[in-house]
Amino acid sequence: MNSFLMTCAMKAAKCLLVDGRLDYSSDEYWYRFGQDYDENKIDVFYCLSTTLLSSNDKDGNPSLFSNLSKEDISIMQDEYKYMSTEMFDSEHFNFIAPYYRQMTFEAYEQTDESAVIHALAPAITDICDAFDYYMENLNNGRPFIIAGFSQGGIMTQSLLVHMSDKQYKQVIAAYSIGYELTEDILKKDHIKAAEGEDDLGVIISYNSVASTDTMWDLIEGNCAVCINPLNWKTDDTPATLRYDGDEASVHVDKEKQVLIVEGLDPEKYDGLGYPIEKGIYHMWDPRFYVKEIKANAIHRAELFKNSINKV
């Protein structure tokens, strides 16, 4: 099965914008690009999650994608700052992150496929253009990681399909955090699900919930695979999560392919201000496993380096 959003994303990728493309040679379209760049560190190309509400167009209708106003860019800062300090810190990583005309929250309420494709086309166009600019002007043939959370997970999967076979050979791993990996997308080029902590060129995908009764069908209703970042198992072997003084047991539900987090208070771990049903730990998917993702990214990068040295 495929998800509605990913179906729209793949169709949007076939109708990238011709006019109105952004100039990624300009610093204004980057949170960070090449500042303090160190070839001894690991490149991470990061795609932001949904952070914005729609603004109205000139006719008073909600625009379903960002226009990258100063206000939009200001709102985007918090996630970039968190991810570039806590998960992909400057000690180990070169954090490369574009601003892009992301789909807004209101777009998720749309049931008309054409409207969602229209909303996703600028986002995917921008992410692909930003990635191409990075590859042509900074990467210099080096291995890299791509990562994204939520809508950024859609962008991560779209980038894997977009890139050339030569570029894919440089991929250490892809972290599609908080977005489903479906059976249909697994059939696409360059999409290979992680099976453990050591495999390379793979995509890591997981979604956390209190139970299968509290699932967000839009982003985790069609999961074909799931990996537990606490123990890097794809079976239902449990692992202990320790976060903010709390402790929980986390295992993969083999039927729904989501992470079941048992032992946390859903009232405490809510949607962080977003209208998300209690027991859906979507907003916590980066935070719960931040140390494990960081350590794993470093580990896989070292394995990739060793594999090159053996050739």
Give residue ranges: language-model regions.
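A general structural signal for short secondary-structure junctions and capping/turn motifs
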Residues: G34-D38, S84-D89, K166, E195-E197, ...
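Conserved beta-strand scaffold positions in the cores of enzyme catalytic domains, especially
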Residues: V44, F95-A97, I203-S205
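Gly/Ala-rich beta-loop-alpha elbow adjacent to hydrolase catalytic centers
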Residues: G148-G152, T156
